[in-house]
Amino acid sequence: GAKSFAGPFTQTRKMGLMKAQIVSQGRVSLVLPDRLRWELFPPDEIVYFVTPDGLAYRNRSSQGAVRANDARTLAAGLDDLRAMLGGDLAQLRKRYDLKAFAVGDDVELEANALPSAEGRGMKAIKFGIGKDRIRPTFTRLVEKNGDSSDIRFGELRMNVPIDPASMHL
């Protein structure tokens, strides 16, 4: 099974009533079971780290940590993304109604927030897995306020060594 993966992505974020679009390039690294590094390249230039301790970030001018109980929406959303990318669907079942569909050679997973999950995490997550049944191909995150992020993964390298020091501040 997969123990880690790393590779590029393109993220298109739609925000606000006018649905302004921001397109970013980045790199994702995941070390199972519980470490995610989400890096957006310039001009965004920020790195998010999701670990069991919570959410941390670093950009050109600052860095900080947010404990798991603070900043719930962002931390929970990134934690849900980590769970989806890492295949920890049991964790998601607590807050989402999960469905899976075959689409050609790929599989798509859809997670819609349960009413009991209001105020925590995402409204919906859609996620694609390639024909190898391991490698993610895309994800769509819809926030409770209607903002969304569409992420297309490039060639993800599986089970590559990832420096543990790169997975936290």
What are the roles of these predicted feature ranges?
Residues 23-25, 43-44, 51, 120-124, ...:
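Short, surface-exposed coil-to-beta transition loops
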